UniProtKB/Swiss-Prot annotation:
InterPro entries: Snake_3FTx, Snake_toxin-like_sf, Snake_toxin_con_site, Toxin_cobra-type. Residues 64-75 are annotated as: Loop III. Binds to muscle nicotinic acetylcholine receptor (nAChR) and inhibit acetylcholine from binding to the receptor, thereby impairing neuromuscular transmission. Binds to Torpedo marmorata nAChR (Kd=0.14 nM). Disulfide bonds join C24-C45, C38-C62, C64-C75, C76-C81. Residues 39-44 are annotated as: Stretch between loop I and loop II. Pfam families: Toxin_cobra-type (PF21947). This is Erabutoxin c. Belongs to the three-finger toxin family. Short-chain subfamily. Type I alpha-neurotoxin sub-subfamily. Residues 45-62 are annotated as: Loop II. GO terms for cellular component: extracellular region. It is found in: Secreted.
Amino acid sequence: MKTLLLTLVVVTIVCLDLGYTRICFNHQSSQPQTTKTCSPGESSCYHKQWSDFRGTIIERGCGCPTVKPGINLSCCESEVCNN
């Protein structure tokens, strides 16, 4: 009986998602580096870059958003990969 209970506990731990979350950079342009713990279910980070009257703008964060034409977007799926 103890063996069965132990087996069930191990199977439960292995099968459950134990709350792993991605960590991405989220600083903008030339600001000091900061990171953010992404929401559950967000498994990627993004690096978005475009130019306007202010110069080159860089935005970083969690997820992989859709962008308008003229905006360079790169998405990645490892820890703090969007620098």
